[in-house]
Structures are given as C-alpha cells and as structure tokens.
Design a protein with these regions (language model features):
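Conserved Helicase C-terminal RecA-like lobe
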Residues: 1-139
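Alpha-helical scaffold elements adjacent to nucleotide-binding pockets in ATP/GTP-utilizing enzyme cores
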Residues: 8-12, 115, 143, 161-162, ...
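Short, histidine-centered active-site or binding-site loop motifs used for metal coordination
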Residues: 41-44, 145, 181
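SF2 helicase motor core recognition
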Residues: 84-88, 112-113, 126-174
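A conserved SF2-helicase RecA2
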Residues: 154-204
Length: 204
C-alpha cells in the first residue's frame, strides 16, 4: 500500500469495527465492510452515497511489471469495473489498443463473442480483461497460458468458474495463476480463503 492507502485503510478499518460492534450484524453488513476495505487496496474509497474517490495505489504498476515478464496470452480478472477501465487505459498506452479485448458489464452484448474469437485467434491480441461476474461463466479462453487476478471478490464459485475459463477442452498448455495482493490487508485473507476453497460469504 502507498502511505495514502495505509492511512485511509486504517481509518476505514476503525470505522468498520465501530459499525460491526454497534449493531446486529448481518452477512451483508459484514461483507460490505470487507469489500470497502478491499476497494481501498485497489485504489478506491467508496462513500455511503455510492460515489467513489481514487486513492494513490501501486497495484496498476505491479500489474504492468508482471506483464513485462509474461509471455503468451493473458486473462486479467478484476473485481471492479473501475479497475477494468484503468487496466485498459494502461494497456493501450503500453501495448496499443489492438493488444486487448474486454468482457465485463459495459461490454456490449453484440460484441462479446467477437472479442472472444479475437482473443482466441488473433496473435496481436494478447490480453482479455474482464470481471468474474460477467466473463467467468461459460466462455472458452484456452489460448491463455497465464491468468492474473488483479483483485478478487469473496465468492468462491466465481473464482473457480473464472479459473476454468482457461482450462476448457482444447487447452494444451500449463496455465499459471497469479494473485496481486496488498500485504497485511484484507487482500491476504480473501486470497487465503479462496485458495483453501472456503466461500467467505457462507462463513461470515
């Protein structure tokens, strides 16, 4: 985390504890507080009115550094639409607009199959960026040999389904999975639970 992120994260953590100590908690209340902390690790602060404010973050730089050391085609999963937009801007700047396609909530329905075909068949298209909520189900992305989780949600099924996009019939390569994690934050807890096949939503 950057110094600014650490400051905001600790403030939000104290606020979350106060909220959880001050009322009868529901699963949704707990998950909301967890995801607010998680958003800070990704560079955003979410307000009660639904607006978001950016906080200086190293995560995008870390992603670009990982991509420099990665060969072949790559699936990049992000939990938030704002992250997808940021990643697309960074890829356009470094690799060009033809280097990627996207598959998330703002991707037009009529373009989605064309984008999958482009990723699978066009050598110039190295990256597909999406959210597990939208792109994690039912599509085949077997040309990828690397899957990067820019950020994770707490839903185990979405994680497992998104992992399987590169492991469909026709995959002949070994697939490498990479999680970007902010140390000493909720990030570590989320990824640890997902790797242990624990559905956080059902454990709260």
């Amino acid at each position: 985390l950057t110094p600014e992120q650490k400051k905001v994260y600790e403030q939000m953590k104290k606020a979350a504890i106060a909220v959880l100590n001050g009322k009868v908690t529901t699963t949704m209340t707990v998950l909301t507080q967890l995801m607010r902390l998680h958003q800070i690790t990704c560079g955003y602060v979410a307000a009660d009115d639904g607006t978001t404010q950016q906080v200086e973050s190293n995560r995008l730089n870390e992603l670009m550094s990982v991509l420099e050391d990665t060969d072949g085609k790559v699936i990049i999963w992000a939990n938030y639409q704002m992250s997808v937009s940021e990643i697309m801007q960074a890829l356009t700047k470094k690799y060009g607009a033809n280097s990627f396609v996207h598959y998330y909530g703002l991707t037009p329905q009529e373009d989605r199959q064309d984008y999958i075909r482009k990723f699978q068949n066009d050598p110039e298209c190295r990256f597909i960026i999406g959210t597990p909520q939208t792109g994690g189900y039912g599509i085949t992305l077997t040309q990828a040999n690397t899957v990067i989780y820019y950020s994770n949600g707490y839903d185990l099924e979405k994680r497992l389904q998104s992992e399987d996009r590169a492991h469909r019939i026709g995959q002949k390569k070994t697939v490498t999975y990479i999680d970007l994690i902010a140390e000493d934050t909720i990030d570590e807890k989320i990824v640890e639970a997902l790797r242990k096949k624990i559905n956080i939503a059902s454990e709260v």
